[in-house]
Every structure is written in structure tokens, then in C-alpha cells.
Curated annotation (Swiss-Prot):
One of its GO terms (biological process) is regulation of DNA-templated transcription. This is NAC transcription factor NAM-B1. It comes from the Eukaryota. SUPFAM superfamilies: NAC domain. Residues 137-210 bind DNA. One of its GO terms (cellular component) is nucleus. High grain protein content (GPC) is a desirable trait in breadmaking and pasta wheat varieties because of its positive effects on quality and nutritional value while Low GPC is a desirable trait for barley malt and beer production. It comes from Hordeum vulgare subsp. spontaneum (Wild barley). The gene is NAM-B1. GO terms for molecular function: DNA binding. InterPro entries: NAC-dom, NAC_dom_sf. Residues 35-204 form the NAC domain. Keywords: DNA-binding, Nucleus, Transcription, Transcription regulation. The lineage of its organism: Eukaryota, Viridiplantae, Streptophyta, Embryophyta, Tracheophyta. PROSITE patterns: NAC.
Length: 406
């Protein structure tokens, strides 16, 4: 019973030679070649003419079946990528060329919905030097596709590079003359001009123009930012830099209340230029000059208290006084009894010899209602002192014990 089973089993097994040496399935005509990842088909002009077009015209085997055979002038350029064998951004084709007129040599450039127009001059294709000189083997022509009918077509971004053979190599593919007349009658003229030309098709993108536009807009934004920065006066940052570099108590006194709602700034006495103070010998010199000008201005009334309101020509009323931390406000502001002598004014500030810091000390007030006013800022012209005397102070503090004499 075992013999029939064994015989039947052996009969069902195929011969061993049927499993070996099976040929691979034939590749479909026009299918893309199997290239390793990273490889691109991007030959030079010489390689296209010598290794592909010349062999195609001579009916010799090509290195690889990668260029499709398509009559380009029967399609629009945006239909060609689907008919290409290989390519991502540029596509290669073998295409015939026909005559525009039966008795002429001009090629027909008309397509389905437009036409190809030549641009520039023909570029000769030279083979590599094998002996003396280089041999001209082909010509390259650039064309642009236009929608519509000539000469008022709409230019597109589709570009064609057409390669054709020249010289002896073009004898088998080009028919430059019309067919001869035989038997007293003209035979039907053939419109075929070239059996094969090699064409490269690609679409020109506007990435370069977009990159230039983005760069220009970026530069315009940078210029706008620079203009906005330069619009601010440089003395604002100079004053802050001077305060950090020298550690001057005089500058710290100005910036002590920057975070508060009411900044310590005397309206009418301090200008924007005076806020940006720079510590150093130059600032001390301006402060000494301001002290001398103040003393000379108050010299006629040095023996008697000087009334700021009587010197005012406009009779302006002092604005409402505001409280600041660290400063004492007089109780007699409501009655407008601001008075001080020149000697008291001269003893309000002490400038250190050879130093770069101005120390303002808060000391007890002398003699009742006399108030010492420290004029902050550098430099202060005599006109600014006179304007301050006639317009009044918005903030007044009691500071004494500082020598105004240079």
C-alpha cells in the first residue's frame, strides 16, 4: 500500500530543473530603469549627443532605455511628463521633426494649443579632444512655449533644449532637400525633416525671483527698524551707560524714580538733552558754570530773600505739588512763599575736587521758610536759569550743605 502512495507523491513533484535558471520577467517597453537610490539622469550636452542621439540615429543599442520616443509637437508641454520614461524635474525625449512647408527646410514648431519659439543663438556641441582640435558633433537650440497663435502668443515657463546632429552624423537622420520630381510629375512631398532629435523639457520655476523678493523685503524691514532706532536721540542711552560705568550718585538721583508713575524731572528747567547726563569732568565743569551763572543772577538780591513770584512776569500759578519719596515738601507752597537767598543757593551743592561724582546731601533747613533748590542738569545756560526763575518750580526739595562756589 505504501508503493502507490510513494509513486503518486513522486509523480506530483515537478522536476528539479524546472525550479532553476528561470529568466526574469521581461521589462515593459518604456518602463523606468531600476537605478540605485540617489542616482539621477543628468547627462551633459556632449553625452546626450554622442552616447544617445548619435547611437539612436545609427540604430545602435543605447546604454540604457531611459529616453522615451514621443512626437513632442502633438502634445502640449504639460502633458509630456506623463509620457516620459524617467525624470522628476526635467524629461528627455526622442522626437521626429517635420517641415513647416513641403518645399522648405524650416521645422514645424506648432503644438496643440500653442507653439515653440526659438530664442537665442544655436550652441555648437563639441566632442572631447581625441587628436588635433575638437570635432563639432551637434547643435543645441533653446525654445520657449507660447500659448495661442503667433505672433501674439502668451509666453509660458516651459523650456525646451533641442539637440540635433550636424556634419556626417546627420546624413542618416536629416533630409534637408525635398524629394526629387520623377516621371514629369511631382511625387508627394515628405514633410519629414529629421528622423530623430533629442529634446530636454523642463518648467522654469520662479523660486529665484521669490528668494530675491523675500531678501529685498527683509532688507526693507531691517532698514525700517534701523530708522526707528535712530529716531531716538543717542543721549538717552549715553546717560544710562554713563550711570552704569561711573556709578555717579548724581545720575542715580535722576534715575532713582524711573519705575514710579511720577518721574523726578523739573519742567521748564530740565530739557530732554539734560536728562541724558554723562558723568565725568565735562559734566562737572558745566555744573560749576551753572552755579556761577546762578550766583550772578541772584547777586542783586543777595542781601534780602529773593521772591520767585515777584520776579515772574506772567504771574503764573505754581502747579500742584506732588510727593516724591526722599524729598521734603514745604508747607508754605499753598501760600506761595517760596524764598531763598543767593548765599543759601550757593551752599546747596558740593562738588568733590578731582572726582567725578556729585553728592547731594539732605541736611536740616536753615532759618524757617528758606528753601534751597538744587538745579539738576548739565549743561545749564543762563537763559535756562532765567526761565526757571520766572516760570517757577514744579517740584521743590530741601537740600543744603552743598557748596555752589567753583
Amino acid at each position: 500500500m505504501g508503493s502507490p502512495d510513494s509513486s503518486s507523491g513522486s509523480a506530483q513533484k515537478p522536476p528539479r530543473h524546472q525550479h532553476q535558471h528561470q529568466p526574469p520577467p521581461p521589462r515593459r517597453q518604456g518602463s523606468a530603469p531600476e537605478l540605485p537610490p540617489g542616482f539621477r539622469f543628468h547627462p551633459t550636452d556632449e553625452e546626450l549627443v554622442v552616447h544617445y542621439l548619435k547611437k539612436k540615429a545609427a540604430k545602435a543599442p543605447l546604454p540604457v532605455t531611459i529616453i522615451a520616443e514621443v512626437d513632442l509637437y502633438k502634445f502640449d508641454p504639460w502633458e509630456l511628463p506623463e509620457k516620459a520614461t524617467f525624470g522628476e524635474h526635467e524629461w528627455y525625449f526622442f522626437s521626429p521633426r517635420d517641415r513647416k512647408y513641403p518645399n522648405g527646410a524650416r521645422p514645424n514648431r506648432a503644438a496643440t494649443s500653442g507653439y515653440w519659439k526659438a530664442t537665442g543663438t544655436d550652441k555648437p556641441i563639441l566632442a572631447s579632444a581625441t587628436g588635433c582640435g575638437r570635432e563639432k558633433v551637434g547643435v543645441k537650440k533653446a525654445l520657449v512655449f507660447y500659448r495661442g497663435k503667433p505672433p501674439r502668443g502668451l509666453k509660458t515657463n516651459w523650456i525646451m533644449h533641442e539637440y540635433r546632429l550636424t556634419g556626417a552624423s546627420a546624413g542618416s537622420t536629416t533630409t534637408s532637400r525635398p524629394p526629387p520630381v520623377t516621371g514629369g510629375s511631382r511625387a508627394p512631398a515628405s514633410l519629414r525633416l529629421d528622423d530623430w532629435v533629442l529634446c530636454r523639457i523642463y518648467k522654469k520655476t520662479s523660486k529665484a525671483a521669490a528668494a530675491v523678493g523675500d531678501e529685498q523685503r527683509s532688507m526693507e524691514c531691517e532698514d525700517s527698524v534701523e530708522d526707528a532706532v535712530t529716531a531716538y536721540p543717542p543721549y538717552a542711552t549715553a546717560g544710562m551707560a554713563g550711570a552704569g560705568a561711573h556709578g555717579s550718585n548724581y545720575v542715580q538721583l535722576l534715575h532713582h524714580h524711573d519705575s514710579h508713575e511720577d518721574n523726578f524731572q523739573l519742567d521748564g528747567l530740565l530739557t530732554e538733552h539734560d536728562v541724558g547726563l554723562s558723568a565725568g569732568a565735562a559734566s562737572l565743569g558745566h555744573l560749576a558754570a551753572a552755579a556761577r551763572a546762578t550766583k550772578q543772577f541772584l547777586a542783586p538780591s543777595s542781601s534780602t530773600p529773593f521772591n520767585w513770584l515777584e520776579a515772574s512776569t506772567g504771574g503764573s500759578i505754581l502747579p500742584q505739588a506732588r510727593n516724591f519719596p526722599g524729598f521734603n515738601r514745604s508747607r508754605n507752597v499753598g501760600s506761595m512763599s517760596l524764598s531763598s537767598t543767593a548765599d543759601d543757593m550757593a551752599g546747596a551743592v558740593d562738588v568733590s575736587d578731582g572726582g567725578n561724582a556729585v553728592n547731594a546731601m539732605y541736611l536740616p533747613v536753615q532759618d524757617g521758610t528758606y528753601h534751597q533748590h538744587v538745579i539738576l542738569g548739565a549743561p545749564l545756560a543762563p537763559e535756562a536759569i532765567a526761565g526757571a526763575a520766572t516760570s517757577g518750580f514744579q517740584h521743590h526739595v530741601q537740600i543744603s550743605g552743598v557748596n555752589w562756589n567753583p
